[in-house]
Design a protein with these regions (language model features):
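Hydrophobic alpha-helical membrane-insertion segments, chiefly the h-region
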Residues: 15-25
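Residue-level recognition of hydrophobic positions within alpha-helical transmembrane segments
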Residues: 2-3, 20, 90, 131
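Catalytic glycan-binding domains that act on GlcNAc-containing polysaccharides
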Residues: 27-188
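N-terminal Sec-pathway targeting helices
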Residues: 1-14
Length: 188
């Protein structure tokens, strides 16, 4: 039997999920199994872990929204075979958890996704990248795509930051020792 707080959290998650599913239809975002998210919301140990995690992160998002985003991110990482801790380290490195961040090169949001990449690879519009759920979805899908094209995590991270074409030209010594990769690993 669910208590009032669990009903509320489930309602919030299902509302968020319905928005995500709507965006799936219009923006080709992935559909995450409802049971996965409902299980994460209903399991007090899992929910508590995400609450603790959210409290430890200094973010532009409020703690409740951040907790829900972490649950979503974790489920999405499972769906795409991307390491959840690595994604959090990329977010910390790229934007320090500021969902409104815009870089000098025009990259947007938590995972600092370039609008050109979002549009060409995932049919996602520039302004949609300010939505943390869309931004994280595109970032994780892109990391998964890069992971399938490179042999190791250092090359994948370098490609995420510098682009896949440029990364293929770098020596393995540069890739393992570049500043971006070191910063991401420091944030693990």
């Amino acid at each position: 039997m669910l208590n009032n707080r669990q009903h509320f959290l489930l309602g919030v998650m299902l509302t968020s999920l319905s928005v995500i599913l709507y965006k799936e239809f219009t923006y080709t975002l992935p559909i995450i199994k409802t049971e996965t998210i409902v299980h994460m919301v209903n399991d007090p140990i899992i929910r508590g872990n995400f609450e603790l995690e959210a409290n430890e992160i200094n973010s532009s998002l409020n703690k409740s929204k951040l907790k829900h985003l972490l649950i979503y991110t974790n489920a999405l990482c499972d769906e795409y075979g991307v390491d959840y801790e690595m994604v959090k380290a990329v977010i910390q490195t790229e934007s320090s958890w500021n969902h409104k961040a815009v870089s000098t090169s025009g990259a947007i949001g938590l995972m600092q996704v370039l609008p050109e990449t979002a549009m060409s690879e995932f049919n996602t519009r520039k302004n949609d990248l300010f939505d943390p759920y869309i931004n994280v979805t595109v970032g994780i899908k892109y990391l998964s795509h890069l992971n399938n094209h490179f042999d190791d995590m250092e090359s994948t991270l370098t490609a995420y930051s510098h682009g896949p074409t440029v990364t293929r030209k770098y020596s393995s010594n540069y890739i393992k020792n570049n500043f971006y990769v070191k910063r991401v690993y420091k944030n693990l």
